[in-house]
């Protein structure tokens, strides 16, 4: 049995289901490229049959990612598998992941079928997927509540049909680690052809046991772990990949396995996913939380100063968190900024140096010194705003006080035209948003607003993340500035541009569909 555990990331498929606003194709690609840098073996990037937008996103990622295997999800339905294959065919290497429920409850109440019919359908669909690729993963949905004898029958049939990976999900986060390990051991005992496939696990955190269950399964013989960065996902979330990866590294003495992950990219990838998905990481989150390497107890601090291993089982540097930070000033040149970005692990393709340096100078003039966390925030915002903008914040001014009604004046560039409006509101941010709504007539409804300090002290950058509702869809926006009202205004303008871009994408998809329809009629 191989001692390498395959890391299967589902941040962009299962993880995205937890988000209040769907990610754009550009945001998904940004995360996919970060996952590729981190070295995930397989990335599941969408459910192509669900929408034209998801199909396009999967296809875009499949075209760009070269070093990780790209995977798409498909139910045991002919159209699902055919559409998944179509979206993936541009990839260097791809996998089709198909699934069907196997527990008595799901078979009876959801599928209204029988186990024999489920097995027959699984065989047919695995064979269909094999027509497109020799890398087919089959999942037994709700395997955690499936009797082991039934599960063994399904697994044996799927392997005989050509499945190369068999995934055992604890779909509802129900099992305990010793139970889950028993399921894996039971399959090795009962399935005669099990050596012809890799056994995978996919766990959920409803009882807080997702990581524990995955590690117990690895100890019992599973050689693929599925999960999401930061543990994002439906309900209580998925297995946190960064936790499993570091547990395998730190406790190699017990597990005796390894991964192909570049551990130095863990922290940066985690931060990127948090920012793009607008899901802050709890301070006490294992591995990547801001408190993961903090020591407040005097006894602990003394022990760490004498020897870090007294209270640290891994170092911040082991996940790419460099604690030595260089500060730059307005006198620092472009070369110094580029050198620092290189030292932090950024490639030139990940940011626009001209735009970054311009933003750096403006910030340095305001706050004097610019630190690593400032540069990272500027690079992230710059990447988010690289796409063509229809709306641009030209000017804003607010007046408010303890006894005054907040008033805002806003100038907004809308294409080639600059429009201005003023409005009152319940505070300066609301006044700015009311003025912007008057200018655009979009009538955007604010659903969520959050403010995060990027840095330390009174001159820290403030990042505002908002989720807004427009025509039944939710859109995410982000803004960054030393002034909170300015950050808020930029976040709303980002939302407007995302709405505008979504409309443009929809027009393009309709144009392509009409073009294809016309070609069919011609034929």
UniProtKB/Swiss-Prot annotation:
Keyword field contains Protein biosynthesis: no
Main localization, broad class: cytoplasm
Catalytic activity: 3-methyl-2-oxobutanoate + acetyl-CoA + H2O = (2S)-2-isopropylmalate + CoA + H(+)
An annotated Gene Ontology molecular function: acetyl-CoA C-acetyltransferase activity
Quaternary organization: Homodimer.
Family: Belongs to the alpha-IPM synthase/homocitrate synthase family. LeuA type 1 subfamily.
Protein name: 2-isopropylmalate synthase
Taxonomic path: Bacteria, Pseudomonadati, Pseudomonadota, Gammaproteobacteria, Enterobacterales
Encoding gene per record: leuA
């Amino acid at each position: 049995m191989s001692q390498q555990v395959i890391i299967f990331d589902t941040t962009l498929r299962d993880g995205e289901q937890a988000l209040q606003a769907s990610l754009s194709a550009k945001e998904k690609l940004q995360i996919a490229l970060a996952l590729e840098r981190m070295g995930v073996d397989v990335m599941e990037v969408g459910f192509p049959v669900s929408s034209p937008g998801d199909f396009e996103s999967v296809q875009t990622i499949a075209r760009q990612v070269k070093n990780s295997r790209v995977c798409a999800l498909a139910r045991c339905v002919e159209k699902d598998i055919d559409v998944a294959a179509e979206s993936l065919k541009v990839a260097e290497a791809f996998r089709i992941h198909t699934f069907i429920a196997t527990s008595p409850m799901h078979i009876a109440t959801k599928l209204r079928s029988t186990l024999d019919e489920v097995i027959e359908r699984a065989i047919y669909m695995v064979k269909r997927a094999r027509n497109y690729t020799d890398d087919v993963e089959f999942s037994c949905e709700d395997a955690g509540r499936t009797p082991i004898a039934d599960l063994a029958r399904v697994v044996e049939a799927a392997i005989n049909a050509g499945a190369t990976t068999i995934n055992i999900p604890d779909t509802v986060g129900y099992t305990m680690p010793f139970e889950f390990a028993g399921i894996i051991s039971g399959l090795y005992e009962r399935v005669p052809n099990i050596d012809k496939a890799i056994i995978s696990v996919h766990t959920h955190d409803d009882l807080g046991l997702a990581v524990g269950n995955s590690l117990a399964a690895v100890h019992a013989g599973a050689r693929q772990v599925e999960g999401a960065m930061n543990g994002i996902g439906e309900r209580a979330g998925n297995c946190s990949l960064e936790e499993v990866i570091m547990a395998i590294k730190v406790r190699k003495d017990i597990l005796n396995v390894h991964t192909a992950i570049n551990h130095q990219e863990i922290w940066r990838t985690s931060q990127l996913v948090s920012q793009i998905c607008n899901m802050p990481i709890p301070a006490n989150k294992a591995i990547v939380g801001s408190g993961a390497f903090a020591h407040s107890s005097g006894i602990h601090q003394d022990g760490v100063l004498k020897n870090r291993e007294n209270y640290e089982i891994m170092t911040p540097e082991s996940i790419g968190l460099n604690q030595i930070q260089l500060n730059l000033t307005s006198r620092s040149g472009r070369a110094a900024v580029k050198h620092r970005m290189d030292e932090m692990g950024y490639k030139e393709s990940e940011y626009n140096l001209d735009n970054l340096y311009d933003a750096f100078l403006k910030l340095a003039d305001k706050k004097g010194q610019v630190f690593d966390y400032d540069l990272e925030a500027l690079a992230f915002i710059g990447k988010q705003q690289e796409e063509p903008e229809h709306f641009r914040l030209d000017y804003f001014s607010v007046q408010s006080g303890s006894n005054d009604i907040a008033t805002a004046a806003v100038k907004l560039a809308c294409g080639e035209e600059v429009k201005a409006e003023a409005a009152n509101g319940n505070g300066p941010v609301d006044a700015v948003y009311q003025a912007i709504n008057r200018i655009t007539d979009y009538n955007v409804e604010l659903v969520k607003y959050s403010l995060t300090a990027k840095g330390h002290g009174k001159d820290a950058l403030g990042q505002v993340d908002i989720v807004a509702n427009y025509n039944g869809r939710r859109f995410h926006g982000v803004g960054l500035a030393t002034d909170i009202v300015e950050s808020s205004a930029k976040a709303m303008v980002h939302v407007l541009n995302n709405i505008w871009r979504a409309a443009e994408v929809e027009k393009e998809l309709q144009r392509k569909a009409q073009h294809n329809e016309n070609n069919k009629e011609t034929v």
